[in-house]
Amino acid sequence: MYKKIKGTDDIYGEDMKYWYFIENTAREITRLYGYSEIRTPIFEQTELFVRSVGEETDIVQKEMYTFKDKGDRSITLRPEGTAPTIRAFIENSMVATGLPKRLFYIGPMFRYERPQAGRQRQFHQFGIELIGSSSSLADAEAIVVADRFLKSLGLVDYTIKINSIGCEKCRAEYKKKLKEYYSDKLDKVCDDCKRRYNTNILRLLDCKVDVEYVKDAPKITDYLCDNCKKHYEETKNILDKLDINYEEDPLLVRGLDYYNGIVFEIHHGKLGAQSAIGGGGRYDNLIKELGGQQTPSLGFAMGIERLIIAVKKEGIPVEEIKNNEVFVAHLGESARIEAIKISEELRDNGISVVFNTMERGLSAQLKHASRLNCRLCLIVGENELERNVVILRNMKTGEQIEIERDYIVGTTREWIDEQ
């Protein structure tokens, strides 16, 4: 027997209602803010992610699914959604239709990580990209969209953490101070931090091992230039005026190299070690880095699997998927075709119908309808058809009535609405 690959999941049954709930909410919220959906390939040229995410990041060094295709090209399953979206923006000359461009995506991503609750090797993200605006209004909008989305899911136990990691000028001075701070601690830090000290010093602040050194490290907000400081203050002021709750975290840097300026993360209080449910920020230099014109941009992404865990942890009721509303059972050769016609009439009126396609007696059909959690059962029998009626049965209470053929749709709809 074949089994699914480690770190992947089969999504079906009762779980599907959570996926529909989150994806439908994401589409509705992005609609309210004028975002259009984009769907990019799940695999791209490896160099796209090396250039964008950063050669020294954990994603590129340890986590990417990379292979050679039959043309000896290096291909990678996408580990995140921003780089493919920006590649599509450049390749398809989307700038020609005007800026800013608002895009969103929902889809699977792939990273070779140690599977655990809320962390899979194939996982799914919802994300937005706001391309073409350098205004603090854009930074605030991204955070507001994220906040409205989470509130629309019914979540309350989450915290938005924000910071500014400044521009290249700010970071140059800050990196010097950070190197000075860690210079006498190199023999004490973890192996990853030893490597990052010379390749990407900011990533030391993201270390989950040497947290005692991180908390006492210099704060980048003390080294922001006037422009970056002004942008950060303007963004916070807008969020304050809109009553968006957030916490400042001067050690927040994010794990991808393309970020600059405003960055943010969202953590949920009931998810333990894997508390991050989303994050984002500015990437003003990414489009130029990937071959386009210098274009200020920003965005965020959220993990759908972790959002589902959060929704369940908070006990948020999620509407059942409205399928299997009616099971149509039939008895006798001459009743089959009429039962099919009745099923199609119900479907024409938006009622979900499961039609019996097996050679079963009535008791077996009713048992199957019960297993499917059908709310109602229509029984179409030869004897009833001779009298121009069918039987409508409530599967929960056992109540049943006879309905004249012409009133099947109306009465069935009434019974569904009453439940």
Swiss-Prot record:
Where does this one sit in the cell? Answer: Cytoplasm
Subunit organization: Homodimer.
Q: What is the protein name for this chain? A: Histidine--tRNA ligase
Please provide an example of a Pfam family that matches this protein in its UniProt record: tRNA-synt_His
InterPro entries named in the record: aa-tRNA-synth_II, aa-tRNA-synth_II/BPL/LPL, Anticodon-bd, Anticodon-bd_dom_sf, His-tRNA-ligase, HisRS-like_core, HisRS/HisZ, HisRS_anticodon
Keywords attached to this Swiss-Prot or TrEMBL record, sorted alphabetically, are:
Aminoacyl-tRNA synthetase, ATP-binding, Cytoplasm, Ligase, Nucleotide-binding, Protein biosynthesis
> Cross-referenced PROSITE patterns, in alphabetical order?
AA_TRNA_LIGASE_II
What is the protein's species of origin?
Answer: Thermosipho melanesiensis (strain DSM 12029 / CIP 104789 / BI429)
Q: Name one GO cellular component term.
A: cytoplasm
Transmembrane segments annotated in the record for this chain: none
Catalyzed reactions per annotation = tRNA(His) + L-histidine + ATP = L-histidyl-tRNA(His) + AMP + diphosphate + H(+)
Q: Name one GO biological process term.
A: histidyl-tRNA aminoacylation
Provide the primary localization: cytoplasm
Please give the family membership noted in the entry.
Belongs to the class-II aminoacyl-tRNA synthetase family.
Enzyme Commission (EC) number: 6.1.1.21
Concerning HAMAP family, the annotation shows: His_tRNA_synth
NCBIfam families associated with the record: hisS (TIGR00442)
Q: What lineage does the source organism belong to?
A: Bacteria, Thermotogati, Thermotogota, Thermotogae, Thermotogales
GO molecular function, one example?
histidine-tRNA ligase activity
